[in-house]
Curated annotation (Swiss-Prot):
GO CC annotations on file: nucleus
Protein name listed in UniProt: Zinc finger and BTB domain-containing protein 43
Organism, scientific name: Mus musculus
Crosslinked positions (Glycyl lysine isopeptide (Lys-Gly) (interchain with G-Cter in SUMO2)): 182, 247, 297, 358, 458
CDD domains per record: BTB_POZ_ZBTB43 (cd18227)
Skewed-composition ranges (Polar residues): 140-149
Entry keyword Ubl conjugation: yes
UniProt keyword terms in alphabetical order: Acetylation, DNA-binding, Isopeptide bond, Metal-binding, Nucleus, Phosphoprotein, Repeat, Transcription, Transcription regulation, Ubl conjugation, Zinc, Zinc-finger
Gene name tied to this protein: Zbtb43
Source species taxonomy: Eukaryota, Metazoa, Chordata, Craniata, Vertebrata
Length: 467
């Protein structure tokens, strides 16, 4: 008789979920917990086995270090971590739309890649969520940031005015408090979903408040013009033009004419339109006229650049594209970038003069080199655009793909260097021995050694001829 012939196999499909549910109840009641996680002073009790099974980060902490107390960085939001901890026990994760990037960052730190994949899918399917997150600041910006208290306050106040996050110890009184916490989170998500058509007035009020807190537009502009920054450009190795916000009436000016006189006439038309739209619009000052002239110059310059290079052009991997990273080209590009930065600085100064905006950082005594735009990973940036590019690294976007092998890259120059492998082009040639090289660093090393050998041989030949 074969072993196991008379055995019976019985399965309980919901047994694992029931065990996790009971473990979660024990966690909330503070029973049999063997590890404490500290997030910004908030202490969360949990079980090592559950944490190690759900997160490789916690697995390393409890197995390799045998830690009973784990302190997470202050950049992590306690509310976000509590929901992720609850997810480890229940398998359900409720993510408010404005905080998806916060969940993505926290899951990346905890190495919970299944959560990272889900957050990435949500962001790819709803790009407006990331635009709102990047435009209105992260949840952990310092008070020195111009976007501080923007989205966080509106989110917390919208949930009923509960601005203080409850301590973890206060959530251990039983299953009833767990249900109340779920109801509170559900109400927060419900209030920040897309509003129905019959509540358009409330939606407009929230949009106006969020736009006014951004600090980049005046009072009238924040209520009349709403724009979003392009999130993702089509994969291409062509140099795309920079994104510049041009208001509707000024875009019409760029189409009608490019000379200063036409700009002045259309400015008068714009003035009359603004007067009809609102009774509180101010009369244009000399600074505003100067601002429009500078803006016109910027538009003309970008139009000229667009005429010089089209998106439909094919990249020459055999010639100029390889030389654009040489020392001469690099120096020219740096000078050009400095000139563009100076022009952009003058552009911003005219905006502030026309709209009467004063930077809050000047009152706090910050200099121009202060990094006012922090990321949740701990890094800070001087300009908002730099933080936006940094966020794309967290998302793992690789917009530049190789048409031959399909490999994708985060930077354009990485793709250009990769194409040398497929084309076999060796653009660097030694003037002494005519040997060619594919990579510039190898070429420079060879030139150094080859020059020394050539000079030594030439000196020896001169000595022989002299004798």
């Amino acid at each position: 008789m074969e072993p196991g012939t008379n055995s019976f196999q019985v399965e309980f499909p919901d047994f694992s979920s029931t065990i996790l549910q009971k473990l979660n109840q024990q966690r909330q009641q503070g029973q049999l917990c063997d590890v404490s996680i500290v997030v910004q002073g908030h202490i969360f009790q949990a079980h090592k086995a559950v944490l190690a099974a759900s997160s490789p980060y916690f697995c390393d902490q409890v197995l390799l270090k045998n830690s009973r107390r784990i302190v997470l960085p202050d950049v992590m939001n306690p509310r976000v971590f509590e929901n992720i901890l609850l997810f480890s026990y229940t398998g359900r994760l409720v993510m408010p739309a404005p905080e998806i990037v916060s969940y993505l960052t926290a899951a990346s730190f905890l190495q919970m890649w299944h959560v990272v994949d889900k957050c990435t899918e949500v962001l790819e399917g709803n790009p407006t969520v990331l635009c709102q997150k990047l435009n209105h600041g992260s949840d952990h910006q310092s008070p020195s940031s111009s976007n501080y208290n923007g989205l966080v306050e509106s989110f917390e106040l919208g949930s009923g005015g509960h601005t203080d996050f409850p301590k973890a110890q206060e959530l251990r009184d039983g299953e009833n408090e767990e249900e109340s916490t779920k109801d509170e989170l559900s109400s927060q998500v419900t209030e920040h979903e897309y509003l129905p058509s019959n509540s358009s007035t409330e939606h407009d009020r929230l949009s106006t408040e969020m736009a006014s807190q951004d600090g980049e537009e005046g009072t009238n502009d924040s209520t009349e013009f709403h724009y979003t920054r392009p999130l993702y450009s089509k994969p291409s190795i062509m140099a795309h033009r920079r994104w510049i916000h041009v208001k509707p009436e000024r875009l019409e000016q760029a189409w009608d004419g490019m000379d200063v006189h036409a700009a002045y006439d259309e400015h008068q038309v714009t003035e009359s339109v603004n007067t009809m739209q609102t009774d509180h619009s101010a009369q244009p000052s000399g600074a505003e006229e100067e601002f429009q002239i500078v803006e016109k110059k910027v538009e003309v310059e970008f139009d000229e650049q667009a005429e010089g290079s089209s998106y439909d052009e094919q990249v020459d991997f055999y010639g100029s594209s390889m030389e654009e990273f040489s020392g001469e080209k690099l120096g020219g590009n740096l000078i050009g970038h400095k000139q563009e930065a100076a022009l952009a600085a003058g552009y911003s100064e005219n905006i502030e003069m026309a709209m009467g905006i004063k930077e809050e950082a000047s009152h706090l005594g910050f200099s121009a080199t202060d990094k006012l735009y922090p990321c949740q990973c701990g890094k800070s940036f001087t300009h908002k655009s730099q933080r936006d590019r940094h966020m794309s690294m967290h998302l793992g976007l690789r917009p530049y793909g190789c048409s031959v092998c399909g490999k994708k890259f985060k930077m354009k120059h990485h793709l250009v260097g990769h194409m040398k492998i497929h084309t076999g082009i060796k653009p660097y040639e030694c003037n002494i021995c005519a040997k060619r090289f594919m990579w510039r660093d190898s070429f420079h090393r060879h030139v150094t050694s080859c020059t020394k050998s050539y000079e030594a041989a030439k000196a020896e030949q001169n000595t022989t001829e002299a004798n």
